Amino acid sequence: MIGSIKNKSNIKILYLHAREIIERLGDGSLDIGFSGFDLLKESEINTQNKINVIKKLNFGKANLVVAIPDPWIDVQTIADLEEIAFEFRDKKKKRLRVATKYPNLTRDFLFSKGVTQFKLVDSLGATEAYPFTGSAELITDITSTGETLRANNPVSYTHLTLPTKRIV
């Protein structure tokens, strides 16, 4: 969809999907756009390097949530998670699997908290089901309300608040 600004015939407004805004800013076919910072962080590094974030806006807040299923009642903190991750490595001879649609944000967050013994599992959707199907031990996802996570009954025990929408 295309819009315009009255008395500004040289300006065209394109209504695009938030992910497409990032792609087009990166390839130079857009001059300015509004999109989620999470999408920028998940884009290719060469795209990230081409985009200048101008201003943080005060809407569209979302959290990157690390969530575990209820049976893991002994995991209450990130330190507990790191301990479990080492147990997986030492006793089960495998890494703790984390299902996510946001590998860059997840990796950066877990590393920043000292959790290093994990393997990312790419999710294309219904991430909250991965622990129940045996595909991962825990998940990370972006949420603003937490409704989907609550509906699927995992316990959310830590989160990282992502920056709100920005002009890029």
Question: Which positions does each model-derived feature cover?
Answer:
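A conserved helix-loop-strand patch within extracytoplasmic ligand-binding domains
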Residues: 49-110
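Paired acidic/hydrophobic, glycine-rich loop segments that form the ligand-binding mouth/hinge
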Residues: 14, 31-36, 137-143
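Short active-site oxyanion
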Residues: 10-12, 29, 93-97, 118
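Glycine/small-residue-rich loop that forms an oxyanion/phosphate-binding "nest" at active or ligand-binding sites
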Residues: 32, 39-57
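Short helix-initiation/N-cap motifs at beta->coil->alpha
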Residues: 2-5, 9, 13-23, 120-131
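BRCT (BRCA1 C-terminal) domain core and associated BRCT-interaction motifs
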Residues: 146-151, 155-157
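Conserved small/polar residues in nucleotide/adenosyl-binding loops
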Residues: 158-164
